[in-house]
Amino acid sequence: MRKKRIGLLFGMEDTFPWALIEAINRRGGHDVEAMPVEISYIKDDRTFDYDVVLDRISHEVPFYRTWLKCAMASGVRIINNPIWWSADDKFFDNLVAQSVRVAVPRTVLLPHKRYPPNTEAKSFRNMRWVNWDEVFAYLGFPIFLKPAHGGGWKDVYKCNSAEEFFAAYDQTRDLAMMAQEAIEFDSYFRCYVVGRKRVHLMRYDPK
C-alpha cells in the first residue's frame, strides 16, 4: 500500500517548513511521508503526486494558486483552501464578522493614492473628496493603515497623528488601503480552523 504523501509548498521561510516535515515523518511511521512540493509545469491531465498539500506561499505567487486549485479539483486536500484567496478582502471580512456579532475595530476603506494600472482621472469621475476630519474623528488615533487585500504584514503603518497618516498614505502607491482603529490588547490569539470542524486557538505576539 502506497504511503500517504504530504507536500509543503513554501517560500523564503526556513525554520517552520523543515521542522514540520521532520515532525510529520517522525510521527507518520510507515503510513505517511512529508516532503517539499516539487512543481515544474502544469498539465491538464489532473495527475498529482500528493494526497495533502500545506500551502505557505501561494498568496504571493499566482502560478502556485492555479496549481493548488487544479490539485484540489483532482481530489488533493489543500490547506488552506486556495479558492478563499479570491475572497481575501479584509474590509468585506469585517462586515461579515459584524453580521454575526463579532466585535471588530472601526474601519474605513480608502481610495487609491495613485491611479491603478490602465486608469486615469476620467476613470474616477464618481469619486468625491475624502473628508479626512470625519475619518479621523470616527477612528481616533492611533490608526493602522493597511492594505485591504493580502497579508504578511506588508505595507502596514501605525499612525499616531494626521501628519504620520498622510506620510504613510503617500507611500501606498496604487494599493486599496483601509484605515483601522488601533486596539490596545492584553491578549492576542490566532484561530486555526481545519475542515470547518476543528478549532485550535494559539497565543500569538504580533509585535
Label the predicted regions:
Residues 1-10, 72-75, 83-188:
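Active-site nucleotide/adenylate-binding loops and adjacent lid/helix of ATP-dependent enzymes
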Residues 10-122:
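Conserved N-proximal alpha/beta basic substrate-recognition cap immediately N-terminal to
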Residues 13-15, 59-60, 85, 150-151, ...:
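Short, solvent-exposed loop/turn segments at secondary-structure junctions
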Residues 36-38, 161, 198:
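Short, solvent-exposed coil/turn linker segments
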Residues 80-84, 153-155, 192, 198-201:
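Generic hydrophobic/packing signal
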Residues 168, 180, 188-205:
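Beta-strand scaffold of nucleotide-dependent catalytic cores
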